[in-house]
A protein has these predicted regions:
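Transmembrane alpha-helices and adjacent helix-loop boundaries
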Residues: 1-324
Length: 324
């Protein structure tokens, strides 16, 4: 099977499952499909940095959490009718998804710019540890932030609004998240084939040669890292809206690891790799989670098998077998 055909099949299946669930009156299945779409979006965000740029970040949960808390803070102040800031100017909360997304993306991009500017001056294990350290800093900061729930997190009692849609309707909220996923996947596909994407992949494979021809590896990787942080923050805002709850766990290293697993399982640098990885992860969580609280052991075995024997992840495994 060609990878293009597999991508179409995966995206069609992701759209078909909630439609079937809607007809069958299974709202929980629609919610699971929405969760897959949102987590896949977070994986696509990491794929910008890891897949194209070779930047192994173990702190991407910080962008996921930044997006989530951007939504939580804005929405909580909107529902309590209190301003976020009341000084030289008044900064109020909002229940508009469009405004929340804009704030989340800008906050994620800004954080990625600052953190990337520092961490990209290192390589290898040093880069990995710096991103992990920043992620843990955000995690412990939110734990000690009592204004927004501290370690207990922050509950949001309303679903934020989008023009023309009833976002409380599970199928409509899924359609919104699915549409955003398609847009970001299309952007990833175009970027991979654009001159910037080609240079970014070249900087991953041979940074010295890229520098020799007069192209700045640091600047190129920083741009990719910022885009990666922005997309992951958008996913965090959607995830918070789905659950109507944010907590410090969104910043934890476990969350960073899960986002990494989505990409590795599905296939690093593969267009729909994060979609496949997120779907498999959620499926295992639902099926094996009911059988044993230690279901992560089975996930670890699967991940080990994929890393050792399936070059290109599950995407590479399926397309290779189809071609043979």
């Amino acid at each position: 099977m060609r990878e293009r055909h597999l991508n179409i099949l995966v995206l069609a299946f992701l759209a078909a499952v909630p439609l079937w669930a809607y007809v069958s009156d299974e709202p929980f299945t629609i919610t699971l499909s929405t969760k897959v779409a949102i987590l896949a979006l977070a994986g696509v965000g990491l794929n910008f940095a890891l897949g194209l740029g070779g930047l192994v970040s173990l702190g991407h949960a910080m962008f996921f959490g930044i997006g989530g808390y951007a939504m939580g803070i804005l929405a909580s102040h909107a529902q309590s009718y209190t301003p976020i800031y009341d000084g030289l100017f008044v900064f109020e909360g909002t229940k508009s998804m469009l405004v929340i997304w804009l704030v989340a993306v800008l906050a994620g991009a800004t954080a990625a710019l600052v953190i990337g500017a520092l961490s990209l001056r290192t390589t290898g294990v040093y880069f990995i540890m710096i991103t992990l350290a920043f992620g843990q800093m955000f995690y412990y900061f939110t734990i000690s932030w009592p204004a927004y729930g501290g370690e207990d997190g922050l509950s949001i009692y309303v679903r934020n609004g989008f023009p023309g849609l009833n976002t409380l309707d599970p199928i409509q909220f899924f359609a919104l998240c699915y549409g955003i996923l398609l847009i970001v996947l299309y952007f990833f596909w175009r970027l991979e084939r654009a001159p910037f994407g080609l240079v970014l992949k070249a900087s991953r494979q041979n940074p010295l040669r890229v520098t020799t021809v007069g192209l700045g590896v640091y600047r190129i990787q920083l741009i990719a890292f910022v885009m990666s942080g922005a997309v992951t923050a958008l996913a965090g805002a959607l995830f918070a809206d789905l659950n109507r709850f944010v907590s410090p766990s969104m910043f934890s290293w476990q969350t960073s690891g899960e986002i990494m697993i989505f990409v590795i399982l599905g296939g690093i640098a593969r267009l729909c790799g994060p979609v496949i990885g997120a779907a498999v992860f959620i499926l295992l969580e639902q099926i094996l989670g009911d059988l044993s609280q230690f279901w992560h052991i089975y996930l670890g075995v699967l991940l080990l098998v994929v890393v050792l024997f399936a070059k290109g992840g599950l995407t590479g495994l399926i397309t290779r077998r189809g071609a043979s």
